[in-house]
Structures are given as structure tokens and as C-alpha cells.
Design a protein with these regions (language model features):
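Conserved catalytic/acceptor-binding region of the Class I
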Residues: 137-212
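C-terminal helical/coil "lid" or tail adjacent to the Rossmann-like core of SAM-dependent
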Residues: 10, 14-17, 28, 198-254
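Core SAM-dependent methyltransferase catalytic element
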Residues: 194, 258-269
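Class I SAM-dependent methyltransferase SAM/SAH-binding core
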Residues: 48, 52-98
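Conserved alpha-helix/loop element of class I SAM-dependent methyltransferases that forms part
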Residues: 26-43
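A short SAM/SAH-binding and catalytic strip from SAM-dependent methyltransferases
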Residues: 105-120
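A short acidic, Gly/Pro-enriched loop at the edge of an enzyme's catalytic core
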Residues: 97-107
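A short glycine-rich, Lys/Arg-flanked "PGG" loop and its adjoining helix->strand segment in the class I
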Residues: 120-135
Length: 269
């Protein structure tokens, strides 16, 4: 996940981004790690982690590739990347050429392309940077306009307020240039139409309970998105109440399904 952008990236704030990256790693890393293990990252692999964030997946790629491997971890803001042994590079995947060290056997990006209006051009760039037989792994969350289903709550009013909040977040993302449904609707087809084979998607979803990692993310979003939420009719009292709702262990909801779409560059001459 990239942590800075010249576009209207919706999530911002230094303290909030640190907390957000930590919570996202807790929520999403197990599924990403499982996906990469299933692909069979070979020893000595050359890997590129796009939008490396805090560096957790770069560290995982380093472990899979082993001592003879190479991992390049890029982001617009590299200050948070903690991946000893990786080559860390400030890089804008929209405009900068692919980093040195390729062609790559594995390229991974999570929660990056959905935020970029130039996502299809970036996808083509990533495909071009693959070695023959190399894998591209793009992970996005399936974010629908209906928001997140609530499973348990202490009151119908809490369900209504959280539903209004989660639907507003989707609209705020879209207004900032993101395509919240890219991962579920268009990504698989876009990869299949490129020079990739064995394209397949894996969907994973989990519930979260008040006070856990999912709760932390929603609490962070009430702070990061306070201005656009207030512009959509939320009051300070609403946002304070939301922070209490998502911290309540009696509250639980589904998380956005993580869609991992993988494709391999043809090895034919």
C-alpha cells in the first residue's frame, strides 16, 4: 500500500498512516503470505514489491527468495519501509520506469492500483517488467457501494450509523479517483487480456469484532476522513459515536473481501 501520492489519496495523516499500515498488515498479511506460498516463489527469485508501505511483504518475499534472491521495495514514501536486505527505492509507479534489478520473477502490489486513475497503464508496465514465466500478483479489496454487513450490534441505531459511514467511505474513495470495485469487477479481465496466462483470482474474507484490527482501521478512518465525512452530513457527535461503536466488543461486521489476482507471463518465445 502506497503511503503518499500526488493524486487525491483519501487516507492521510502521519500518525494515522502508521497505525493504518500496522492494522492492515494484521488484517491482510496472512492471506497475502498464503497466496505467495501457493505460487511457489523460487529460491533466488527477483522480486518487486510495489507500494511497500511498512515492508512486511517485502520481508516475506526476502524469506521466500532466500539468500540468492533479490527484493526491490518501492513506494512514494520510503520512510516506513522496514525490510533489511531489500533494496529500498523512492518510486512513482505511475510515471517512473521499472526499477533496476529486473526483469522480475514476482511482482506484488496490494491496495495500490485501485487508488490510481492510471491503473490500466500501470498494469501494463508491471506486466512488461516481468521475466518470462514470472508471476504478477495484484491484491485489491472488494469494496461495494452497499458498505459492510453488520453481524452483531448492541442497537439498531448503531447498525444504521455504521452502514451510513461505510457507504460514505466508498463514495469518498471514488471522489478521490479510486475505483473501489476494480479488484472485483475489472482486474481479472484486464490481466487475462494482457500477455499473462494461468490468470486466477482468490477471494478471502473475515469478520472483525470491536476492539480488533478491523476496529482500529475504522477508528482511523473516522479521523483521516473527518472533513469529507462532515461534508456529507456527519456531525462530530456521529463520528465520536462511531469510534465507540467500532471499539465495542458486542459489535462485529464483515471485512472487505481481499481479491488476490495472479497471472504468469508466458514463457514461450
Amino acid at each position: 500500500m502506497s503511503t503518499a501520492s500526488e493524486t487525491q489519496y483519501a487516507f492521510h495523516g502521519a500518525v494515522e498512516v502508521d497505525d493504518q499500515l500496522d492494522a492492515l498488515e494484521t488484517m491482510l498479511d496472512p492471506g497475502t503470505a498464503e497466496c505467495l506460498v501457493r505460487l511457489g516463489v523460487p529460491a533466488g527469485a527477483r522480486c518487486w514489491e510495489v507500494g511497500a508501505g511498512g515492508g512486511s511483504i517485502a520481508r516475506h518475499l526476502l524469506a521466500l527468495a532466500g539468500p540468492g534472491g533479490r527484493v526491490v521495495a518501492t513506494d512514494l514514501d520510503t520512510s516506513r519501509i522496514a525490510a533489511p536486505g531489500a533494496e529500498i527505492l523512492q518510486h512513482d509507479v505511475r510515471w517512473d520506469p521499472a526499477p533496476d534489478g529486473g526483469p522480475f520473477d514476482v511482482i506484488h502490489a496490494r491496495w495500490v492500483l485501485m487508488h490510481l486513475p492510471e491503473r490500466r497503464r500501470v498494469l501494463s508496465k508491471l506486466v512488461d517488467a516481468l521475466a518470462p514465466g514470472g508471476w504478477l500478483v495484484i491484491e485489491e479489496s472488494m469494496v461495494t457501494p452497499e458498505g459492510l454487513p453488520v453481524l452483531t450490534s448492541s442497537s439498531p441505531a448503531d447498525v444504521e450509523l455504521f452502514g451510513r459511514f461505510s457507504r460514505a467511505v466508498v463514495r469518498i474513495l471514488a471522489d478521490a479517483g479510486a475505483d473501489p470495485q476494480w479488484g472485483a469487477r475489472d482486474l481479472h479481465a484486464a490481466m487475462a487480456e494482457s500477455s499473462l496466462e494461468d490468470v486466477h483470482s482468490i477471494h478471502r474474507t473475515d469478520s472483525w469484532t470491536g476492539g480488533g484490527a478491523g476496529s482500529r482501521l475504522h477508528d482511523i478512518h473516522t479521523r483521516q476522513l473527518r472533513e469529507p465525512l462532515c461534508a456529507r452530513g456527519f456531525t462530530d457527535s456521529d463520528l465520536d459515536r462511531l469510534q465507540n461503536i467500532v471499539a465495542d466488543p458486542r459489535f462485529s461486521a464483515m471485512w472487505y473481501p481481499l481479491v488476490s489476482t495472479c497471472g504468469r507471463k508466458t514463457s514461450r518465445a
